């Protein structure tokens, strides 16, 4: 089966609570099925086992939700991003939400090579004051190293925090305010 690239669409989607416990490979299969049900003219790889040409920016860990997952879909026939989105919406399973569809230049570097960082939002149960939480956060961010042991090996997580200034925003629910 020979396929020619006619169009590449960049899709931004949300992975919600309903599907946060499915693996990345299962998510890929869900997207493949959804695109097939919507009769999207997917381009396929060459070879003995042709696969739809779908590429994700980065796998999301199991148990995480996201409002900014990105994937590229290669089509063998041109279709407007609006028509693509409109045709896909009724076939999306609960937990997947289409946020945007844009045309992407077919020769762009892969999504995986373009990922530079990720931003996480963490909810922490806290029964102390706002000032105590801010102090703990500043203590964490001013540490020279943040060691974590995994599989018997120590890792320093501190170099992975790029911009501590952006992490100082703190919102506590009203039940915790003093």
PLM features: what roles do these ranges have?
Residues 27-41, 86-94, 138-142:
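Short, intrinsically disordered, mixed-charge
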Residues 43-75:
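Short, charge-patterned binding micro-sites
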Residues 67-121:
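Ordered, amphipathic secondary-structure segments that act as subunit-interaction surfaces
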Residues 79-86, 128-136:
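Short, conserved charged micro-motifs
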């Amino acid at each position: 089966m020979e396929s020619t690239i006619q169009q590449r669409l960049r899709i931004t989607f949300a992975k919600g609570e309903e599907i946060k416990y499915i693996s990345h490979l299962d998510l890929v299969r869900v997207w493949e099925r959804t695109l097939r049900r919507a009769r999207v003219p997917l381009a396929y790889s060459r070879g003995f086992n042709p696969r739809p040409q779908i590429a994700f920016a980065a796998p999301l860990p199991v148990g995480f939700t996201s409002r900014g997952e990105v994937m590229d879909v290669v089509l063998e026939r041109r279709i407007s991003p609006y028509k693509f989105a409109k045709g896909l919406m009724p076939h999306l399973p609960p937990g997947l939400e289409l946020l945007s569809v844009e045309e992407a230049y077919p020769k762009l570097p892969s999504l995986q090579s373009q990922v530079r960082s990720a931003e996480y939002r963490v909810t922490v149960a806290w029964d102390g004051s706002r000032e105590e939480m801010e102090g703990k956060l500043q203590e964490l961010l001013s540490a020279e190293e943040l060691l974590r042991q995994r599989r018997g090996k120590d890792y320093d997580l501190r170099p992975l925090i790029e911009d501590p200034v952006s992490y100082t925003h703190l919102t506590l629910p009203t039940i915790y305010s003093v």
